[in-house]
Amino acid sequence: MAGEADGPFKRVLVPVLLPEKCYDQLFVHWDFLHVPCLKILLSKGLGLGIVAGSLLVKLPQIFKILGAKSAEGLSLQSVMLELVALTGTVIYSITNNFPFSSWGEALFLTLQTITICLLVLHYRGDTVKGVALLACYATLLLALLSPLTPLAVVTMLQASNVPAVVVGKLLQAATNYHNGHTGQLSAITVFMLFGGSLARIFTSVQETGDPLMAGVFVVSSLCNGLIAAQVLFYWNAKPPHKHKKEQ
């Protein structure tokens, strides 16, 4: 029995999904109704699933822009504010030594969001501005991750995520409303972001216990829900130039 308990199954689960006490509780004593350990297992599993999914979540958006050779319908201000919010989460989480499963997707989404920023600028004819933006962003990121940056500054950056998320999503919602369609906005990306932010409310409470982190995801879920609702509402709407081509 001891050999089974110390087998490869345990070596995979214990460092990744469960503390040893919970592994013993669930898989040695077979107590599958132990709520605290089940919460840990669910939170870690969801967290790792979100992190894995984040590797792909914005790729449909990137491919849609590349395929159309256009970023029509995407608000640059909204994308940049989302980049600010994601960067704040990454820096705050690293500074506070939060487990990677509780914030890892923010890192991958940051890389994909900066790519979208560059594509929007490129297809607007501002490629040089995009390169300058990337250089400035990298410099600022290194400065914020430096030990010389006060914790108060990092905390303030994370607190600014709420207005950044709200304003950014409202700008995108306003763009959609003004255009009467969602342009090159990817429905897959929008719905994945909505689902991920909802799941993150639970995992951030469970894994970090940080009300600031949880609050950001609550607000993010509401805003992502608004954009998702617009995607459904404008599902059959097409940009004017497409109507002209069909006529």
UniProtKB/Swiss-Prot annotation:
Record's keyword annotation contains Transmembrane helix: yes
Signal peptide per UniProt: none
GO CC, alphabetical: membrane
Domain PQ-loop: 39-105, 159-216
Lineage top rank: taxon: Eukaryota
Transmembrane segment boundaries: 46-66, 74-94, 103-123, 128-145, 151-171, 185-205, 213-233
Keyword Nucleotidyltransferase recorded: no
InterPro entries per record: MannP-dilichol_defect-1, PQ-loop_rpt
Modified residues (N-acetylalanine): A2
SMART domains: CTNS
GO biological process: oligosaccharide biosynthetic process
Alphabetical keyword list: Acetylation, Membrane, Repeat, Transmembrane, Transmembrane helix, Transport
Localisation per UniProt entry: Membrane
Topology within the bilayer: Multi-pass membrane protein
Family the UniProt entry places it in: Belongs to the MPDU1 (TC 2.A.43.3) family.
Cited function: Required for normal utilization of mannose-dolichol phosphate (Dol-P-Man) in the synthesis of N-linked and O-linked oligosaccharides and GPI anchors.
Protein's name in the database: Mannose-P-dolichol utilization defect 1 protein
Lineage of the organism: Eukaryota, Metazoa, Chordata, Craniata, Vertebrata
